[in-house]
């Protein structure tokens, strides 16, 4: 299921729902055409989590495939809860919305090529002291990708 939303700054905003868990081999992909190669944009990974999420952080592997075939892969860590264990996302129910910076926060992000890009998002969580990773991560209900105009 794909869910989209709309506002003035939005260029692209799409979610994909997950089953009861997020398998470590499941890559959620989002394809879009670059709006232009002149202006700068903010790029986000959006997540929804519920109380089944048992961790204070989240590790993701995010890969951007460019139109010319170049691929840039980043391993990213996000804080999901404060030291008291309260989730940092927004929302009044047990489902929290998280808007996590991907590109544009340290320096302006400009699409360097015209054409179709694909972004893949994969969970890379591990238990302390474990190498193999968490096979089925519970508590993440939706994964999304968003592009906004800079203000």
Task: Label every PLM stretch briefly.
Residues 2-5:
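C-terminal motif of bacterial Sec signal peptides marking the signal peptidase cleavage site
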Residues 66-70, 84, 151:
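Solvent-exposed strand-loop boundary residues in beta-sheet-rich modules
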Residues 15-16, 74-82:
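Solvent-exposed serine/threonine-rich low-complexity stretches and specific carbohydrate-binding patches
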Residues 78-80, 88-109:
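A beta-strand/beta-hairpin structural motif
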Residues 30-39, 108-112, 146-151:
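Extracellular and analogous surface-interaction loops
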Residues 9-63, 69:
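Start-of-domain marker
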Residues 47-49, 77, 106, 121-125:
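A mature extracytoplasmic/lumenal domain signature
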Residues 112-149:
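Internal, hydrophobic beta-strand segments that form the core of beta-sheet-rich folds
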């Amino acid at each position: 299921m794909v869910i989209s939303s709309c506002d003035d700054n939005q260029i692209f905003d799409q979610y994909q729902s997950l089953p009861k868990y997020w398998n470590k081999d499941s890559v959620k992909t989002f394809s879009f055409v670059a709006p232009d190669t002149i202006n700068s944009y903010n790029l986000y990974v959006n997540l929804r989590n519920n109380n089944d999420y048992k961790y204070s952080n989240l590790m993701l592997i995010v890969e951007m495939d460019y139109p010319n075939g170049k691929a840039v892969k980043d391993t990213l860590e996000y804080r999901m809860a404060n030291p008291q264990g309260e989730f940092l996302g927004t929302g009044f129910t047990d489902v929290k919305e998280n808007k996590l910076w991907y590109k544009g926060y340290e320096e302006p992000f400009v699409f360097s090529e015209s054409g179709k890009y694909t972004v893949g998002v994969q969970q890379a969580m591990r238990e302390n002291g474990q190498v193999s990773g968490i096979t089925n991560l519970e508590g993440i209900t939706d994964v999304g990708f968003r592009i906004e105009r800079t203000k």
